[in-house]
Amino acid sequence: ISNGGDPMRARKAMAAVDKRLVRRDAQLIQLLDPPFDKSDLEPGYIKGYVPGVRENGGQYTHAAIWATTAFAMLGDKERTWELFAMLNPINRGSRPEAMERYKVEPYVMSADIYGATPHTGRGGWTWYTGAAGWMYRLSVETLLGLQLEEGHLRIAPCVPDDWESYKIHYRYRDTSYHIEIKCGGEKSNHATRVTMDGTVLNETGLIPLQDDRQEHHVEVMLR
């Protein structure tokens, strides 16, 4: 995520995450595996949790969101959206048996999800978690690609290949920007043209921001 690592090692690390920590059977993303319970190692307070709970081998949702962000930055759309579906709490309440297992509200983010029997898939803390803010950033900034920079918006999405278009209504102080992003198919993630109010502005994906108290209609073409 910091872009500070070697690209090849980053891909190897994320491949290991996918292989070792993504639990498709339980629809969760573990923080680590195996848990600290049978060794002399002392990693700190996390060893105080029973195996599979919170940071000791459960899903710690902050890290799960960061992992999903990392897959998006690597351009792995399929993996990104698969993990996003795991993170989305609404999917925990899609069936009565899933809700019975989850036991907490399916409309807010849970700080953690248990990763060991007999409580695998049970939600932990809700409401009181910064994971909600990170989920918002993943959804808006990384997936939809709406990134606020100094003086402008940058559009750099990671959306499924079968999306034809999507819209974002963005309010900048007293000015409204109605943005339609048109996708160009299989590898569409780079803006090729930005048009505002019928005038072509650039081919960089940048939308200049000006608080003129007007409504602007923006079209962004991706390839």
Can you describe what each PLM-predicted range is?
Residues 1-223:
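Acidic, mature catalytic/reactive cores of soluble proteins
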